[in-house]
């Protein structure tokens, strides 16, 4: 899949789940399950409840996503 097909949405982390997954509430009021991207894990960027994040999603499964950026 090419990067042009990915959907990006801003959201807020509402809950921390096991195995580095998070429940994220998007701006359009949908709740999804998301995990951190590999570069965020590699650089040890912490994500906590209440953080504003940017989530990438595939158009094929709109219930799961990948956190690619944490806003300061």
Swiss-Prot record:
It is found in: Cytoplasm. It comes from Parvibaculum lavamentivorans (strain DS-1 / DSM 13023 / NCIMB 13966). Belongs to the IF-1 family. GO terms for molecular function: ribosome binding; rRNA binding; translation initiation factor activity. One of the essential components for the initiation of protein synthesis. Stabilizes the binding of IF-2 and IF-3 on the 30S subunit to which N-formylmethionyl-tRNA(fMet) subsequently binds. Helps modulate mRNA selection, yielding the 30S pre-initiation complex (PIC). Upon addition of the 50S ribosomal subunit IF-1, IF-2 and IF-3 are released leaving the mature 70S translation initiation complex. Pfam families: eIF-1a. Keywords: Cytoplasm, Initiation factor, Protein biosynthesis, RNA-binding, rRNA-binding. NCBIfam families: infA. Component of the 30S ribosomal translation pre-initiation complex which assembles on the 30S ribosome in the order IF-2 and IF-3, IF-1 and N-formylmethionyl-tRNA(fMet); mRNA recruitment can occur at any time during PIC assembly. This is Translation initiation factor IF-1. InterPro entries: NA-bd_OB-fold (IPR012340), RNA-binding_domain_S1_IF1 (IPR006196), TIF_IF1 (IPR004368). One of its GO terms (cellular component) is cytosol. CDD domains: S1_IF1. The keyword RNA-binding applies. The gene is infA. PANTHER family: TRANSLATION INITIATION FACTOR IF-1, CHLOROPLASTIC. Its main location: cytoplasm.
